[in-house]
């Protein structure tokens, strides 16, 4: 039986440290960090994450402001709105939910978010900082949450074979960069990789971030491995439930350590979002 690596203890530790740091910032400089959330429409997934972010902000003593716009907002009006949010001096970090409605040019709108307030790597400038090892850039929250999980559970990365299944700019590619920073030997693969199960079996640390329910099965893994499951998918076998990219029931008996879905990496992301907003606030007020 594998050790199941839950996300809650990681999130709790991050929040405890962040609460102390925010209290110190308030005392020393009279500044309260603020997260600004930009949302168009009211998709249930966006509202769910927004609720979690607001709750985490409140728990650590951080302000949070929601900037909500109708789904039929036009391009010019939304560009003006995003520019105004970006210019607010009291907003230190910005999260914008995507995808935006099809009538909006999302690529152009992302350029309007100030890079120094881009706490979820939405902008090209933010991504450039991550991929050039610029410490003033913020990686997306999900890959950062993966790294927080590895650190909290004292899982060594240096010299280890790290296989990332998934090549998105949201998780796979930035996660590979974060693992490389800590001297992991990284392989990025995807659903079309030749002999994907064999490549995955060669890993010391296997991270599934491909967005396919239960794709990673027992023949992808071996004894001694650590498996981090980033996926969040509708469970094809249990209507109304969620599952990861890993078939937990068949993989868990084989490997040494594994994260569950839900209650794994996903439960750490809002704490990371708040941490990166605090860091942005520090840099803006240095």
Swiss-Prot record:
Annotated residues for binding of NADP(+): 166-168, 191, 232
GO cellular component: cytosol
The EC number(s) this enzyme carries: 1.5.1.5, 3.5.4.9
Reactions catalysed according to its record: (6R)-5,10-methylene-5,6,7,8-tetrahydrofolate + NADP(+) = (6R)-5,10-methenyltetrahydrofolate + NADPH; (6R)-5,10-methenyltetrahydrofolate + H2O = (6R)-10-formyltetrahydrofolate + H(+)
Entry-linked SUPFAM superfamilies: Aminoacid dehydrogenase-like, N-terminal domain, NAD(P)-binding Rossmann-fold domains
Domain of life: Bacteria
Keywords noted in UniProt: Amino-acid biosynthesis, Histidine biosynthesis, Hydrolase, Methionine biosynthesis, Multifunctional enzyme, NADP, One-carbon metabolism, Oxidoreductase, Purine biosynthesis
GO terms classed as biological process: L-histidine biosynthetic process; methionine biosynthetic process; purine nucleotide biosynthetic process; tetrahydrofolate interconversion
Assembly and oligomerization: Homodimer.
PANTHER family from the UniProt entry: C-1-TETRAHYDROFOLATE SYNTHASE, CYTOPLASMIC, C-1-TETRAHYDROFOLATE SYNTHASE, CYTOPLASMIC-RELATED
Functional summary from the UniProt entry: Catalyzes the oxidation of 5,10-methylenetetrahydrofolate to 5,10-methenyltetrahydrofolate and then the hydrolysis of 5,10-methenyltetrahydrofolate to 10-formyltetrahydrofolate.
UniProt record similarity statement: Belongs to the tetrahydrofolate dehydrogenase/cyclohydrolase family.
Protein name as it appears in the record: Bifunctional protein FolD
Native source organism of the sequence: Desulforapulum autotrophicum (strain ATCC 43914 / DSM 3382 / VKM B-1955 / HRM2)
